[in-house]
A protein has these predicted regions:
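Charged alpha-helical initiation segments
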Residues: 1-47
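Amphipathic, well-ordered alpha-helical segments in soluble domains
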Residues: 16, 20-27, 48, 52-55, ...
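Hydrophobic/aromatic-lined pockets within catalytic cores
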Residues: 29, 57, 61, 65, ...
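Short, hydrophobic, well-ordered secondary-structure elements
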Residues: 39-64, 149-156
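Short non-catalytic regulatory patches outside canonical folded cores
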Residues: 54-119, 126-131
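Substrate-binding/catalytic groove segments of enzymes
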Residues: 116, 125-140, 159-167
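Amphipathic, Lys/Arg-enriched alpha-helical patches that create a basic surface
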Residues: 141-184
Length: 188
């Protein structure tokens, strides 16, 4: 995939999702104090962002190892952890105006298990009205600022990794940087 294809198929959509996320700040400030705030808009964004993350990780994993069947996230995580140096430690921070929050979306990776935010996504997607035994609230409440921000950070990090490794032959062109309005520039 070349740069133009990457921009067309993935980056434009990321920027669209990021803009939708930033539009929520009219109602909810992007800061840790609001992490538990949930809404229909966060639910919509959470599902869209996680679907996009699923798509880009599928393409990345297929470039490493062709599979006759679609890989689930546990399978993808194993491939990602094996093929991306320091995968669990990849992090990004929000820009200063958003409290400079450091996010490590993959840090809780364990073999045969997905990340907390991905588990929350699946519960929101498939068991939205079920009551969580810990919180005593429906899983709908997991469509909150924290999970949306973490999922968006994972997508941003992964798009950067994908672009650097699969679209630019491992070299970063200083004339083309994947700028985010939410996150600081990705550092390898």
């Amino acid at each position: 995939m070349n740069r133009n294809e990457f921009v067309k198929y993935y980056w434009k959509h990321y920027k669209f999702l990021e803009k939708q996320f930033l539009d929520t700040e009219r109602y909810v400030a992007i800061e840790k104090d609001n992490y538990a705030v949930y809404s229909n808009e966060f639910l919509n964004l959470f599902v869209l962002i996680c679907n996009e993350y699923d798509a880009i990780t599928a393409e990345y994993c297929n470039s490493i190892k062709e599979s006759a069947r679609p890989l689930n996230m546990v399978d993808k995580n194993e491939l990602l952890c094996e093929n991306i140096n320091g995968f669990k430690d990849l992090s990004i921070s929000t820009k200063f105006k958003y409290d400079n929050i450091k996010i490590l979306p993959f840090s809780k990776y364990k073999k045969d298990k997905t990340y907390d935010w991905w588990q929350a996504y699946n519960l929101v997607k498939h068991k939205r009205s079920n009551i969580d035994s810990d919180t005593k609230k429906p899983n709908y409440y997991k469509a909150n600022l924290k999970n949306v921000l973490t999922a968006l950070s994972a997508l941003y990090i992964f798009l950067n990794k994908f672009y650097i490794e699969k679209c630019s032959s491992g070299t970063v062109n200083p004339d083309f940087v994947l700028n985010s309005d939410v996150f600081n520039d990705f550092q390898q």
